[in-house]
Amino acid sequence: MQPMTHNPGAEAVAAQVIANAARGLAGGTTASAAVTALVPAGADEVSALAAVAFASEGVEALAANAFAQEELTRAGAAFAEIAGIYNAVDAANAATM
């Protein structure tokens, strides 16, 4: 039988994943103003339509980014919870020995 171990540093990694997701979400929020407020290159209809199309695609990309960052936050929280459970069980078992 192989020995089973758990690295207590997993909680720190989970916290880093959550922090990275928060930074990614903040970056997307910051970028939203620049992406949606693009000024057309010229006064013609094509430039106006291109600016609208770019803004529309940008909004979709920002929504996908927000969803991805929320998923990373949930994953980091799950890792933190699991690591906390492992650490608590290990500490309890060590105290009984």
UniProtKB/Swiss-Prot annotation:
Pfam name, any one = PE
Entry superkingdom:
Bacteria
InterPro entries per the record?
PE-PGRS_N
Q: What happens when the gene is disrupted?
A: Increases efficiency of DNA conjugation when disrupted in donor strain.
Transmembrane segments annotated in the record for this chain: none
Family as reported in the entry's similarity comment: Belongs to the mycobacterial PE family.
Misc note: DNA conjugation in M.smegmatis is unidirectional with distinct donor and recipient strains; mc(2)155 is a donor strain while MKD8 is a recipient strain. Mutations in a donor strain that alter DNA transfer do not always alter DNA transfer in a recipient strain.
Q: What does this protein do?
A: Part of the ESX-1 / type VII specialized secretion system (T7SS), which exports several proteins including EsxA and EsxB. Plays a role in DNA conjugation, in at least a donor strain.
Q: What is this protein called?
A: Uncharacterized PE family protein PE35
Q: Which organism is it from?
A: Mycolicibacterium smegmatis (strain ATCC 700084 / mc(2)155) (Mycobacterium smegmatis)
Could you read off the lineage of the organism from its UniProt record?
A: Bacteria, Bacillati, Actinomycetota, Actinomycetes, Mycobacteriales
Tell me the gene name. PE35
